[in-house]
Regions:
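ATP/NTP phosphate-donor binding region
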Residues: 1-60, 70, 107-110, 305-306
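Glycine-rich beta-strand-to-loop/alpha-helix junction loops that act as flexible
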Residues: 9, 63-65, 88-90
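Catalytic core of DAGKc-family lipid kinases
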Residues: 30, 39, 77-199
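Short Gly/Thr/Asp-enriched flexible loops that form oxyanion-binding sites at enzyme active sites
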Residues: 68-80
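Glycine-rich phosphate/pyrophosphate-binding beta-alpha loops
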Residues: 144, 148, 202-215, 281
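Gly/Ser/Thr-rich active-site loops/lids in small-molecule metabolic enzymes
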Residues: 159-167, 209-211, 217-238
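ATP/nucleoside-binding phosphotransfer catalytic cores, i.e., glycine-rich phosphate-binding loops
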Residues: 188-190, 195, 220-221, 230-306
Length: 306
């Protein structure tokens, strides 16, 4: 079947527009001529993916960043197609790319040419939209509420010359400096509720978010489980003193960081906490999340394929 490329030139605060011509040449050299479909705004990648997958295009190659990939995943799933997904990183964050060992555009093109397919989990989430309406969406990397979602809201459109990590940390500063937390209540599968005053909670399929923070070092994208990381209420000084733990894989060694695994998660927050999926702000809690095991066919680096 014919492949199609969905390109988001706005990804990475415009960095994708500069990178795309060189990446397009690489694609043509390794895969031959491909039809490129360019997004025009938020949600358009989902619409394009739904239409293309529904009419038989396979694979769909998503060129952009984590948000673009999220939209394309949602489009494939809503189409009912089993089309394969290929990834082309054009933005700086690339947290899901880190989780699967995708090193950059050139490596991504070679991965697409090799064509190794891995069946990976997707997480379906029901939550409250901006107007209070019920919504449903999927993520492949990480959903977070609290600090992570507040930072995702602030970071949109920030200076593209700042690395993804620096943008995220700068966006988190106001919340950390204010020392704000929220009362979180979690239900994991059929267990009794867990309650904490929290700074942030991550529901993880992948391992990285926020431009390289290793928020779920034990997560696997094909184990049928959500890794839940909860950080109790902390302030700026405490985060600064433990910054290395965010990137070293030792985050669970801190006494205020908690880790669980579940197939299904329900969450409430007081006050209602903002929610982001794969780096994109989408609404607020309450939420219900459930793993869809191996629901997506992902073209993956050979070293990570089963």
């Amino acid at each position: 079947m014919a492949a199609a490329v969905i390109v988001n030139l706005y990804a990475g605060a415009g960095a994708a527009r500069r990178r795309w011509p060189a990446v397009a040449r690489l694609l043509a050299e390794r895969l031959g001529p491909l039809a490129a479909h360019f997004t025009e705004g938020p949600g358009h990648a989902t619409l394009l993916a739904h239409q293309l997958a529904g009419t038989g295009f396979d694979p769909l190659i998503a060129a952009g960043g984590d948000g673009t990939w999220n939209e394309v995943v949602n489009g494939i799933l809503s189409s009912g197609s089993s089309a394969r997904l290929g990834l082309l990183p054009l933005a700086k964050g690339g947290d899901f790319a880190r989780s699967i060992g995708l090193a950059g555009p050139r490596h991504a093109v070679e991965t697409l040419a090799a064509g190794e397919v891995r069946k990976v989990d997707v997480v379906r989430v029901r939550f409250r939209g901006p107007a209070g309406e019920g919504r449903e969406r999927h993520f492949i990397n990480i959903a977070s509420f609290g600090l992570g979602a507040e930072a995702a809201l602030r970071v949109r459109g920030w200076n593209r010359f700042l690395p993804g990590r620096a943008r995220y940390l700068a966006a988190a500063l106001p919340t950390l400096a204010a020392g704000r937390g929220f009362d979180a209540r979690l239900w994991l599968d059929d267990a009794a509720p867990i309650e904490f005053n929290a700074t942030t909670v991550a529901l993880a399929n992948g391992r990285y978010h926020g431009g390289g923070i290793l928020i779920a070092p034990q997560a696997a994208i094909d184990d049928g489980l959500i890794d839940v990381t909860l950080v109790e209420r902390v302030g700026l000084a405490e985060v600064a003193a433990n910054l290395r733990l965010l990137y070293s894989g030792d985050i669970y060694s801190h006494p205020k960081v908690h880790h669980w695994r579940a197939v299904r998660v329900r969450a409430e927050a007081e006050p209602a906490a903002p929610l982001e999926l794969d780096g994109e702000p989408v609404g607020t809690l309450p939420l219900e999340a459930e793993v869809l095991p191996r629901a997506l066919r992902l073209i993956s680096p050979a070293a990570t394929a089963p």
